[in-house]
Every structure is written in C-alpha cells, then in structure tokens.
UniProtKB/Swiss-Prot annotation:
HAMAP family: Ribosomal_uL24_B. It comes from Laribacter hongkongensis (strain HLHK9). GO terms for molecular function: rRNA binding; structural constituent of ribosome. This is Large ribosomal subunit protein uL24. GO terms for biological process: translation.
Amino acid sequence: MQKIRKGDEVVVITGKDKGKRGTVLRVLPTEGRVVVEGVNVVKKHQKPNPVKGQAGGIVDKTLSIDVSNVAIFNPATQKADRVGVKTLEDGRKVRVFKSNGELVGA
C-alpha cells in the first residue's frame, strides 16, 4: 500500500522548497517520486511547434521530487506527520497518522 497518494496534502521537508505545502498531482511509484502542485517549478525554454500547435516561449513546468522529501500533512496537529498502515477487523488496510492514530483522509 502506498503511503502517499494522489490528492494528499503534503509538506516538503527538505530541499530548496522546504516548508512548502501542496497537493500531490501524480505519484510515480516505480521511480519513487511524486509531483506536488507549486513545488519544484522550473522554467523551460520551448521552441514553437506549428505541427502540434504549440507556441514558443518560456513555460513554467512542475517536476517530480523524491517521495522521501515529502511528509503528509496532518490537519489535526497542523504539522507534517508520518503514515502507518493498520488492518481493520474486516480485513481492509487503511492509512493512519503515526502521531495520533487517526485515519488519513477521514
């Protein structure tokens, strides 16, 4: 089970964007990376491509960051938190915050 999923609110805990909060737009599990909204934004100089209908210029692009550089945001404590996996009585696995044991996304 993935501890960070698409739609989770995360906090960057290390790197040039440390302290920024954003929503996970995409998870790349094979690469161990996530794309977070408003984090690791770079400027790309793009040539015009009339075949695809693309205009040229400087475009902002959001790149992925390593999943170890983000932590899920716990709304109860208003801090970054770790995530654990708990099995319920009916056999389902759910994600829980390590600090207070509450369900993630509940």
